Amino acid sequence: MPLPAPEIGLVVSYEYLWKRQEQNQTPDKARPCCVIVLYIQSEKDDDPDGPDTIKAVYVPISHVPPDDAQEGFELSPHAKKVAGLDSERQWVVVSECNLDSWPTDIRPIHGKAGQFHYGYLPPGEFTKLKQAFLRFQQMRKLKIVRRL
C-alpha cells in the first residue's frame, strides 16, 4: 500500500520525538500521530527550479495519559474506532508537537506491512484537538520539536 496523501486529521504511524527526548534526537518508536497542520514551503527563493516541500505538524497519540508537563485529552471510543485505533484508552497530547517534512519518519504500522495510516479523527474530535492545540499556541506554551 502506498503512502497516503497528506491530509488534515489523518492519523499516521510516525516516529514521534517527545520534547523530553529532543537532545537524543532519537524517537523511541513509531506511534499514532494526527496531522494537525499542513503547509507548503517554497524553495524558489534559493533555487528557482527548486521543489516545494510539504511540511506537517504532528501531535502524538498514546496509551499513557499525559504527564504533569503535558496536556491532552482522552479519545472517545467512537473516535478511536473511526480513526482505526485499538479500543484501549488513548490520549492525544496537545501541548507539544513535531514539525517535519512530509513524509519523513512515517513508518508502516506494526504488524501491518505496507500500511502507513490508521484512518482519520472524526470531525468533532478533530475540532476539539484543533481548539486545544491553538489555545496552547496562543498562550505561547506549545512545545515544538523541529525535525527539519
Residue ranges of predicted features:
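Structured loops at beta-to-helix junctions and adjacent beta-edge loops in soluble globular domains
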Residues: E15, I61, S95-C97
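Short, charged beta-turn/beta-strand-edge "cap" motif at the junction between a beta-strand
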Residues: L17-Q21
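Compact nucleic-acid interaction/catalytic patches
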Residues: E22-A30, I36-A83
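C-terminal terminal-subdomain/extension
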Residues: D68-Q70, E74-L148
